[in-house]
Amino acid sequence: MIQMQSNLDVADNSGAKRVQCIKVLGGSKRRFAGVGDIIVVSVKEAQPRARVKKGDVHRAVIVRTKKDVRRTDGSVIRFDSNAAVLVGKNEEPIGTRIFGPVVRELRGKGFMKIISLAPEVL
């Protein structure tokens, strides 16, 4: 469950290390975002000489959350950290690699590029 002011790790090689959610997209009064949702983020920490700089505003897809993700079969999956992947306007990832596992729910939301780049899909 991600809301405004939430800090997330970045799970790709775009150059950003930490980002902060500044808007949850999808509705005028929407407060929370979960796995597979798109948010607007501000880069708070970045690597030097990277594609993205500190202070840049980008869209991101949430790939891991500390909050439980419930499946239809009754199983639950949760992670140790909140993480996102930076995407462009056409919802394609900015980076060329994804670090760490991502959830299977991204497939249903149409993020096949992220699924194919991820080393593990849970």
Curated annotation (Swiss-Prot):
Keyword Ribosomal protein included in the entry's annotation: yes
Domain of life: Bacteria
Any one GO molecular function term: structural constituent of ribosome
GO cellular component: cytosolic large ribosomal subunit
HAMAP family xrefs: Ribosomal_uL14
Quaternary data: Part of the 50S ribosomal subunit. Forms a cluster with proteins L3 and L19. In the 70S ribosome, L14 and L19 interact and together make contacts with the 16S rRNA in bridges B5 and B8.
Protein name per its UniProtKB record: Large ribosomal subunit protein uL14
Gene field: rplN
